[in-house]
Amino acid sequence: MPVSLLDDFLAYTLAGTRPAASEAQGTCAGGVRWSWLDDGVLLMEPAVQEEGMRSVLVSAGVHGDETAPIELLAFLVRDIAHGTAALTGRLLVILGNVDAMRDACRYRDDDLNRLFSGRHLQLPQSHEAPRAAALERAATRFFAAAPDNPGARWHIDMHTAIRASAFEQFALLPHTGKPFSRAMFEWLGEARISAVLLHTTRGNTYSHFTAQACGALACTLELGKVRPFGQNDLTRFAGADHAVRHLLAGMRGEVRAPMPRAFTVIDQITRQSEAFELLVAPDVANFTPFAKDTVLARDGDYRYVVRHDEERLVFPNATVKPGLRAGLMVIETTQDTLSKLV
């Protein structure tokens, strides 16, 4: 067994090492079976596989410069391999944009997290397009072998944000046309996530793909700020790390924590041309509230004006390519959302 693969999956991946066929799978502590499937893709399965057990995909590095969750995943692999973290279900570990990770950048040509659900087919020349297709295939194959039972398929996609936030750690749930899951909200509470953004239209993120195409309970976690490898204070991510490990150990639900607040997307600001202006401070924090009638953006004849008594701006980015989202507008819907969980 190539010890370095499991002891430091991050370093192994950054080095671009590809194991020989005879060294691409094996058994580690507790009889856990592992298989290296692709660059940055590792499957781990318990020795005893029970009917109905969870299949959990945990991904990080879909943006190559979001290093803290990548480091957390490397430590998780090491701890499972050494038997200090329990695994009672199937686990697929994915480090997303490995080339961008090696270059210490967010992406090379295009944002990988906007290329899923087949959108990569529209950008065949993009460096990220083949990786998006490969990650779709990896998720599809993984979940195809999982029971199609409620709560049996999970996808946790971990990120860090470019900017500060009124809620330092928050989650985004994809739109599937179905009611949102109480089990997911309870797990997010255990992860110490303080706010959840609820999408109202289908998107092209990895969690949207796994929710829609694979039937997974999927979420995107935003866990803090972007920092270089080795400069993260991982204690700040202890809540999410602990909750992921509990999920993999089959212990979810044993810790009761406050439910996160819910915010529903009601509109988006789109950059339509090079004349686009986002009329907020460059360092405005995610979830900053704005009062009714505030003009937040303009682009030729286009204006975005706040319509509700209060709307909050999330993911403002004035430098995206024309045609892409320059910000999401949300309103708080906590009481209504929590009353409708299933």
Swiss-Prot record:
Q: Which reaction does it catalyse?
A: N-succinyl-L-glutamate + H2O = L-glutamate + succinate
According to its UniProt entry, the function of this protein is described as: Transforms N(2)-succinylglutamate into succinate and glutamate.
Q: Which CDD domains match?
A: M14_ASTE (cd03855)
What residues sit in the active site?
Answer: E222
Identify this protein by name: Succinylglutamate desuccinylase
Its gene? astE
Q: Which UniProt keywords apply?
A: Arginine metabolism, Hydrolase, Metal-binding, Zinc
**Recorded family membership:** Belongs to the AspA/AstE family. Succinylglutamate desuccinylase subfamily.
